[in-house]
């Protein structure tokens, strides 16, 4: 289990409270699909993913990105208990969707980039360290059900 200090929790929640989940979620998932094109195979039903502009303008990408980022909100509420909080999502992604758990790490890294672009100087090294710790812990929690 990962332990978050009071300072780390404050750094994460402070930035999260200013986050536009819809905008940043679509941006994060879109960036994942552009930068790591092999991840597109999990989103066949999303329609046109033929170019970066098609991906970033795709309403299904934006909607699912919002859903993904909303789950990060759940992570923030359950920072001290991530594995149980993500048990159902882990099972879904493992047993039903067969997502390579390495993709969770990639998405976490993309999330950190999105945060840096959105928050600039507010995204200090200390804030980045707290967020990097969180996205890594979420990736581990999501990979928990994998064999």
Curated annotation (Swiss-Prot):
Lineage top rank: taxon: Eukaryota
One Gene Ontology BP term is:
oxygen transport
Instruction: Kindly list the GO molecular function terms attached to this UniProt entry.
Output: heme binding; hemoglobin alpha binding; metal ion binding; oxygen binding; oxygen carrier activity
Residues that bind heme b = 64, 93
Keyword Transcription regulation attributed: no
Listed GO cellular component terms? blood microparticle; cytosol; haptoglobin-hemoglobin complex; hemoglobin complex
Keyword Endoplasmic reticulum attached: no
The Globin domain sits at: 3-147
InterPro entries of this UniProt entry?
Globin, Globin-like_sf, Globin/Proto, Hemoglobin_b, Hemoglobin_oxygen_transport
Q: Name one Pfam family in it.
A: Globin
Key words, A-Z: Heme, Iron, Metal-binding, Oxygen transport, Phosphoprotein, Transport
Q: Which SUPFAM superfamilies has this protein been placed in?
A: Globin-like
- Modification type Phosphoserine: residues: 14, 51
Q: In which tissues is it expressed?
A: Red blood cells.
Q: State the oligomer form and interacting partners.
A: Heterotetramer of two alpha chains and two epsilon chains in early embryonic hemoglobin Gower-2; two zeta chains and two epsilon chains in early embryonic hemoglobin Gower-1.
**What does the protein in this record do?**
The epsilon chain is a beta-type chain of early mammalian embryonic hemoglobin.
Give the record's family classification: Belongs to the globin family.
What is the name listed in the Swiss-Prot or TrEMBL entry for this protein? Hemoglobin subunit epsilon
């Amino acid at each position: 289990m990962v332990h978050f200090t009071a300072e780390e929790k404050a750094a994460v929640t402070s930035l999260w409270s200013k986050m536009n989940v819809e905008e940043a979620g679509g941006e994060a998932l879109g960036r994942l699909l552009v930068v790591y094109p092999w991840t597109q195979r999990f989103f066949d039903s999303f329609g046109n993913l033929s170019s970066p502009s098609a991906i970033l303008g795709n309403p299904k990408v934006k909607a699912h990105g919002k859903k993904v980022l909303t789950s990060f909100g759940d992570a923030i509420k359950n920072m001290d208990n991530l594995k149980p909080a993500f048990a159902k999502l882990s099972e879904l992604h493992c047993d039903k969707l067969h997502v390579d758990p390495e993709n969770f790490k990639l998405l976490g890294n993309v999330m950190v980039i999105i945060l840096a672009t959105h928050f600039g100087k507010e995204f200090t090294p200390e804030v980045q360290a707290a967020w990097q710790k969180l996205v890594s812990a979420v990736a581990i929690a999501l990979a928990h059900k994998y064999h």
